Design a protein with these regions (language model features):
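A short, conserved structural fragment
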Residues: 28-35, 95
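A short, Lys/Arg-enriched interface patch at domain edges and termini
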Residues: 48-81
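Residue-level "edge-of-site" marker
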Residues: 23, 36-37, 73
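Polyanion-binding surface elements
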Residues: 1-26
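Alpha-helix C-caps/helix-loop-beta hinges
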Residues: 26-27, 56
Length: 181
C-alpha cells in the first residue's frame, strides 16, 4: 500500500497544512493512516483517506456543512472504502443519506431516492488520485486483452538498410541516420 505524507496530502486535498492537521489530529474527524511519530514529523495517508478528505472538503466548501457532527459518517465511509477497490469506484457517485448511511450508485443510473441525499461525483477526485498514487485508470471493456498492442507505422522514414542489402548482396549499404542530441 502506498502512502503520501502531509506535504503531498495538502496538494491533493486542497487543504492548508493547518486545516489538514486540525481534521486529522486535533479534532480527529478523519484520522491519518499513520500518525506522526513525533512533533514535527509528517503523517502518512493512503488513497482512501485522501479521497475521504477531498469529500469532506467538498462538503465544507460547496455545501457549507459543519463536519464535526458527521464523524460517524466519515468512519463508516473509511471502513467501506477499505473494502472497495479503486477501479470499482470509477463511474460511481457517492450518495450521503444522513447519519452514517451512504451508498455508491452508478453515475448513469437514475436514482430512485426514497430519502434525501447529497450526491458527490467521485470521478474528478479519482482522476487526481490515480496520477499521484499510480493507480490504474479504467479501460474500455474490449472483450479480450491485446497481447501486442497496435502501434502506428510511419511510412515517411527511410529504411536503415538500403535495397541491395535486402536481396542478399554482400555489399550492404547502410543509409545515414540522423543523430539525436
Amino acid at each position: 500500500m502506498r502512502f503520501v505524507t502531509t506535504p503531498k496530502a495538502t496538494v491533493l486535498t486542497g487543504l492548508s497544512t493547518v486545516t489538514l492537521r486540525e481534521w486529522t489530529s486535533r479534532r480527529a474527524l478523519i484520522p491519518a493512516d499513520k500518525p506522526p511519530r513525533s512533533k514535527g514529523s509528517p503523517a502518512s495517508f493512503t488513497w482512501q483517506t485522501i479521497l475521504l478528505l477531498r469529500v469532506a472538503a467538498t462538503l465544507r466548501n460547496r455545501f457549507h456543512l459543519e463536519l464535526q457532527p458527521h464523524r460517524t459518517l466519515f468512519a463508516s465511509l473509511k471502513a467501506g472504502l477499505r473494502r472497495t477497490s479503486f477501479i470499482a469506484l470509477w463511474d460511481k457517485t457517492l450518495a450521503l443519506q444522513g447519519g452514517d448511511r451512504w451508498s455508491l450508485v452508478e453515475a448513469a443510473e437514475t436514482l430512485p431516492l426514497i430519502d434525501d441525499a447529497i450526491l458527490i461525483v467521485l470521478q474528478p477526485h479519482l482522476e487526481a488520485l490515480s496520477v499521484e498514487f499510480a493507480l490504474p485508470l479504467p479501460r474500455v471493456p474490449a472483450g479480450q486483452l491485446e497481447l501486442f498492442p497496435a502501434r502506428p507505422v510511419d511510412s515517411t522514414t527511410s529504411p536503415l538498410v538500403g535495397p541491395s542489402a535486402r536481396k542478399g548482396n554482400p555489399d550492404t549499404v547502410l543509409l545515414a541516420r540522423g543523430r539525436s542530441a
